[in-house]
Amino acid sequence: MADSNPHPNEDSLELVDGSRVAVIGGGPAGSFTSYFLLEMAERADLEIEVEIYEPRDFSCVAPGGCNMCGGIISETLVQNLAAEGINLPDTVVQRGIESYVLHMDVGTVRIETPIDEKRIAAVYRGAGPRDIQVRKWGSFDHHLEGLAVARGAKVTRGRVTEISMDNGRPSIAVKGGEPQAYDLLVAAFGVNSPALKLFKELDFGYEPPETTKTFIREYFM
């Protein structure tokens, strides 16, 4: 029986034909990683497998389809993506924002953008609020995930519940599923993800970053 591990050297950090990559997190970080990794592999004439693990379906309305994060990005990012051939539709990029307003107990402060040309863009992270009647926009996260899939990535709708090492290779499993071994594991989840605990339990010195609690609220307009 042929060895399923494409690497004859367990200590190799180089991806080769047949290498398998797991990306935990299907938000922008995970989708961008998958998209550009597959693009670079194509340029290098490598055939690799990329699998994104994401429990949320970003095409769904209500909290179940939202990453629970504010949809604010720099327009520089939008322009850089366009230079890479990735054009975000108007249904995803809602509008440009000229300033922030900081409300405090001692008063209100308006924070203008430092350079007029470098505006801030608002995007929709989910597909819409729970009681939406007509969908007028698309999800930023769903759009990016779709680009990664079009590049060749596979999406598994499930929450990773186990991470271990199998003969020097990372192995992960979702609830009710069999462990899957990979050659590279990418952690592309947020600081609130329970996957942080799984990495800490691997006992290789990882410590979750310090965080500050933030309350984020969206208003339907």
PLM regions with names:
Residues 11-29, 51-53:
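Beta1/beta-strand and adjacent pyrophosphate-binding region of the FAD-binding site
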